[in-house]
Each structure stands twice: as C-alpha cells, then as structure tokens.
Amino acid sequence: MARAAPGSGASPLPLLPALALGLVILHCVVADGNSTRSPEDDGLLCGDHAENCPATTTQPKRRGHFSRCPKQYKHYCIKGRCRFVVAEQTPSCVCDEGYAGARCERVDLFYLRGDRGQILVICLIAVMVIFIILVVSICTCCHPLRKRRKRRKKEEEMETLGKDITPINDDIQETSIA
C-alpha cells in the first residue's frame, strides 16, 4: 500500500469556510452608500472626440442631478438632508451617519463602514490565525499518536519474529559418537 508524502495530501476542506467568509466580507466592503453621487466634472463636452467646449460658448453649465428641496419637503428626511432629483422631480435624502432608508428612517447597525478595508484586513488575519492554530493543534495531537502506533507495530514485529525462531537448546540432544 503506497502512502502519500507528508504534507502532500492536505485537504482543501478547511480553506472553504475561510474563502466563504472572505467573499462575504468583500461583498460588504464593495457595497456603495445609499445615495447617488453628483458628477465630478461640471464642464460640458462637445464634438465627436469628447473634447471640452471653448469658454466662449453661451451654453449654461449643468449644476448636477440635484437641487434644493422645495419648502413642502422641508421635513421629508427623518435623519438626514433633503435634496431634489431634478430629472425625476422627486425628493431624495442624504442620510446622517448611522441611518439608512429612503427617508433615513432606519438605524444602520453597520454604519462604521468608513473603516471597511481595515475591518476586512482584521477579519482575514483573524481567520488565518485561527486556521494556523487549528493546523498546529492537529499536528500536536497526531504526532504522539503516530509515535505510539509505530512503537506498537515495532513491538508486534519483534514478538512475531521472536516466536518464529525456535530455541536451540530445547530441541537438540547431545549424542556422543566417538
């Protein structure tokens, strides 16, 4: 029976929970906030090659997707700041830290998302430390068992070898031929 070299038969099974946890945490880290961001480029583009328009044009510059909320929506957002979506003619909210929802009505338990990258690194390090501790514990427990098994096997071999050799003194009788 051929035995695999030590360390070559490592099962990928313990890595699956770590991989799953990493993917879940990555999904949380990649998730965006709860509002649409305004465009960063306020300039107008014209022409086929998306070049900037000359400064002499009289076209008004776009201010963005949002404007101030009308007075009728003054208290529309419960825990946040109101802004008006120009294209849809509807109010929208920019929630205060720790709140979420269309009108900032829900408490966001995971509002410490600013440090998501740091949380991801800490979680991955913790998983790796737990994995290393698990591997060291398994090796520490298995090594004495292997030694004991080898010792028993060696003792059994010695016993079987000892039984096969018949004692010389018991079976041989001396005869005198002279």
Curated annotation (Swiss-Prot):
Keywords: Cell membrane, Disulfide bond, EGF-like domain, Glycoprotein, Growth factor, Membrane, Mitogen, Secreted, Signal, Transmembrane, Transmembrane helix. The gene is BTC. PROSITE patterns: EGF_1, EGF_2, EGF_3. The keyword Disulfide bond applies. Monomer. Interacts with EGFR and ERBB4. The keyword Iron-sulfur does not apply. This is Probetacellulin. Residues 140-178 are cytoplasmic. Expressed in a wide range of tissues, including the mammary gland. Residues 32-118 are extracellular. One of its GO terms (biological process) is epidermal growth factor receptor signaling pathway. Residues 1-31 form the signal peptide. InterPro entries: EGF-like_dom. Growth factor that binds to EGFR, ERBB4 and other EGF receptor family members. Potent mitogen for retinal pigment epithelial cells and vascular smooth muscle cells. Residues 65-105 form the EGF-like domain. The lineage of its organism: Eukaryota, Metazoa, Chordata, Craniata, Vertebrata. PANTHER family: PROBETACELLULIN, TRANSFORMING GROWTH FACTOR ALPHA. GO terms for cellular component: extracellular space; plasma membrane. Glycans are attached at residue 34. The chain crosses the membrane at residues 119-139. Disulfide bonds join 69-82, 77-93, 95-104. One of its GO terms (molecular function) is epidermal growth factor receptor binding. Residues 112-178 form a propeptide.
